Amino acid sequence: TEGPYFYVPMVNTTGIVRSPYEYPQYYLVNPAAYAVLGAYMFFLIILGFPINFLTLYVTLEHKKLRTPLNYILLNLAVADLFMVIGGFTTTMYSSMHGYFVLGRLGCNLEGFSATLGGMISLWSLAVLAIERWVVVCKPISNFRFGENHAIMGVSLTWTMALACTVPPLVGWSRYIPEGMQCSCGIDYYTRAEGFNNESFVLYMFFCHFMVPLIIIFFCYGRLLCAVKEAAAAQQESETTQRAEREVTRMVILMVIGYLVCWLPYASVAWFIFTHQGSEFGPLFMTIPAFFAKSSSIYNPVIYICMNKQFRNCMITTLFCGKNPFEGEEEGASSTKTEASSASSVSPA
């Protein structure tokens, strides 16, 4: 059922469909589902906010973390905080009422904040892949990665994210309640006159999903080849082989993390867009959104907590200046000094 600035995934044959800005949507799913949604958002908030805020705090506290190669990781933490503060809190609050209680303006603000955080995060992963490829594979001779390059990378993520999130605010597509009608996102559902949703969805799918995906696969593919070549040149070195395995594991985790986060959401959004008019339940879009929102937790785990330097500094901060595991960390890392080119992207 399509209305002004909303689309409810239910045929209004019985006349029970109401505006998701004004009335509870308990006719869509069991009211218990809204309680589950609220509990899940609360879970993401109590885990996502501390770990991402701690990343920023630890970086301010430890000067050795403030290096150009870590700028993009901090940007990733900021993006996740955008999602937590601007998106998860409002979704949790709305789910407690069973509909989007913040109105049309609130929908625009929530949709913009959550999508902005998601897009910054997505492009940060692509820029991170480029940076690691450039540093390890050295496609440009005599190139030295510096602060200006890091700032350019961070600026690119914000530019691309804003290029995706601002247009719906000014008339190219729009933000509407989606799924269980407690959070807002891009309108994949309708061909509302005057909004040019078709062209925007095509632009978003190819420029803001396929392009980062191609970048990530290319850069990490080249990086793996470089690491394997380095390991093949030192076959007798056990430390080099171990470093190769760790880099391979890290790359696999990065690619899987990206796909788990964005592939379900992008695939379902594309299906809805290409099958407009077909019947689908509210959970059809809600569940893939869970995967995308969960990135605020597993992104910092994969990209930050698995980074030895960040991990040690976090532990030191949490234990008031002492690292009770320092002996174990040193013992585990002392065998990795030979494979410098591989360990430069190693997670531990």
Swiss-Prot record:
It is a multi-pass membrane protein. Phosphorylated on some or all of the serine and threonine residues present in the C-terminal region. The keyword RNA-binding does not apply. This is Rhodopsin. Residues 59-70, 131-149, 222-249, 306-348 are cytoplasmic. A lipid is attached at C320 (S-palmitoyl cysteine). The record marks E110 as: Plays an important role in the conformation switch to the active conformation. A motif ('Ionic lock' involved in activated form stabilization) lies at residues 131-133.
